[in-house]
């Protein structure tokens, strides 16, 4: 049955018309996952040069650009009786004052104080009766700087589309570019509960007809359908094998609603040098650094890491070029082993690189993407139950998300963005996660931890710094493996 469903989705996923105001199955799942102490918003803490703009001036700059992201004036409307996925509707009471906020750091205005502020902001759940985002302007940062803290619900945006959205708020030159004028915004009347329910029931009734039209297309293109079916079967088997429970760890404990936030700065050129000297990719280097830091942290807290291999969920974007700039989530993921047992930094990186290479060939991400698309066809009650079941099962120990950002300076109202640190949500019984983002030659780590379960989060941040230094020092002495000879030997063995 499982294989049949995945196969059907593979060949029909482009056949059914999508209501652009209806949340996708994955976006809906993020709302279902937001229960108890688990908040499902993403964010970032940014540091800018120069004095902060006046609040009214800053708010005006945001107001002038809102027509470019109309979703930011919409709220989630749930379907009565759970008869459909939620939809986006205009908020007739939209008030920019509520979403764009202003605060000041107390003297001396240290970066530590900014991180504390960001953690407190991140600890509060977004109000679902309003558009799901907040933007905090924090002035008074030392050395003539100011901060910006963003908070947006995961149902609205993913990491890659967030970078596209930044182009709406930021300029690529110090001199602000002219903003195209938008029409005066008049919200559509909010639909009644009966209207929302009726629309959802009509969509559910017409969906079988849409699928039937997709089935007819299989008859017209049997070869393409056969290829898709083979890929789906392969991906389904790989994903099933990856779904085994992750090992127990001190990071998988009950959490509360409050958060801590720590950051680490790294140099992109240094990480590139490491991967050039040892092999692999920059993402492999990042995962090896996380594995080394986590292993050192656990040993420092008295835990044995002998033979311990944790599992990280590594989100990847499946957003196409045509979808860049669109809001909503287009992500899949790998379940990547973290060799925290390994004391040798070079062996650790090569182990990560080899396993990630195997995962990419295994089509695990394809299987996860297909199951994600299953939620677009499944009844909403099943989607909600599946999301809650996933939150109860320990499929991974922590999240490590690495988002490539722009490699040239960005500006906000003429002020240069100096650094950005991502903030990733904690799922149920997930006490820590790693968000990594590259920007303008930097690679910055944002560590989010549960306030009670991770009282030593800053220590884990120092372990990340140590793991980078350890790997950087060892890399020049490493002998890069000869891939061509290995590939030739592999081909000879097949002959």
Predicted segments, located by residue:
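Soluble acyl-CoA-dependent acyltransferase catalytic core bearing the H(X)4D motif
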Residues: 2-26, 34-39, 43-430, 434-465, ...
């Amino acid at each position: 049955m499982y294989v049949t469903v995945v196969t059907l989705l593979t060949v029909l996923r482009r056949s059914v018309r999508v209501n652009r105001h209806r949340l996708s199955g994955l976006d809906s799942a993020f709302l279902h996952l937001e229960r108890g102490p688990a908040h499902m918003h993403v964010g970032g803490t940014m540091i800018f040069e120069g004095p902060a703009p006046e609040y009214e001036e800053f708010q005006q700059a945001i107001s002038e650009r809102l027509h470019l992201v109309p979703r930011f004036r919409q709220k989630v409307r749930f379907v009565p009786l759970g008869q459909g996925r939620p939809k986006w509707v205009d908020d007739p009471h939209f008030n920019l004052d509520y979403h764009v906020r202003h605060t000041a750091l107390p003297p001396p205005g240290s970066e530590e104080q900014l991180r504390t502020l960001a953690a407190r902001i991140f600890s509060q759940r977004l109000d679902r009766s309003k558009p799901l985002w907040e933007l905090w302007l924090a002035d008074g940062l030392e050395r003539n700087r100011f901060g910006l803290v963003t908070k947006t619900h995961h149902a609205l945006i993913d990491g890659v589309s967030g970078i596209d959205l930044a182009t709406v708020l930021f300029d690529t030159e110090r001199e602000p570019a002219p903003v195209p004028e938008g029409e005066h915004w008049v919200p559509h009347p909010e639909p009644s509960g009966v209207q929302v329910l009726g629309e959802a029931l009509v969509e559910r009734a017409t969906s079988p007809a849409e699928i039937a039209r997709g089935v007819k297309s299989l008859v017209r293109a049997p070869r393409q359908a056969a290829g898709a079916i083979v890929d789906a079967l392969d991906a389904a088997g790989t994903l099933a094998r990856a779904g085994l429970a992750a090992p127990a760890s001190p990071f998988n404990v009950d959490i509360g609603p409050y958060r801590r936030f720590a950051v680490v700065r790294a140099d992109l050129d240094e990480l590139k040098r490491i991967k050039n000297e040892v092999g692999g990719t920059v993402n492999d280097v990042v995962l090896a650094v996380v594995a080394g830091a986590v292993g050192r942290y656990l040993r420092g807290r008295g835990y044995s890491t002998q033979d311990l291999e944790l599992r990280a969920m590594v989100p990847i974007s499946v957003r196409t070029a045509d979808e860049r700039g669109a809001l909503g989530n287009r992500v899949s993921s790998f379940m990547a082993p973290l060799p925290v047992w390994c004391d040798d930094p070079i062996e650790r990186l090569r182990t990560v690189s080899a396993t990630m290479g195997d995962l990419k060939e295994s089509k695990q991400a394809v299987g996860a993407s297909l199951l994600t698309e299953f939620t677009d066809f499944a009844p909403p009650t099943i989607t909600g139950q599946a999301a809650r079941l996933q939150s109860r099962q320990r499929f991974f120990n922590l999240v490590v998300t690495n988002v490539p950002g722009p490699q040239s300076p960005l500006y906000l109202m003429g002020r240069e963005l100096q650094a950005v640190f991502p903030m990733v949500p904690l799922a149920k019984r997930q006490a820590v996660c790693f968000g990594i983002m590259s920007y303008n030659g930097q690679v910055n780590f944002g560590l989010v931890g549960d306030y009670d379960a991770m009282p030593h989060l800053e220590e884990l941040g120092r372990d990340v710094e140590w793991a980078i230094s350890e790997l950087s020092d060892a890399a020049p002495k490493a002998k890069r493996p000869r891939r061509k000879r290995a590939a030739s030997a592999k081909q000879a063995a097949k002959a």
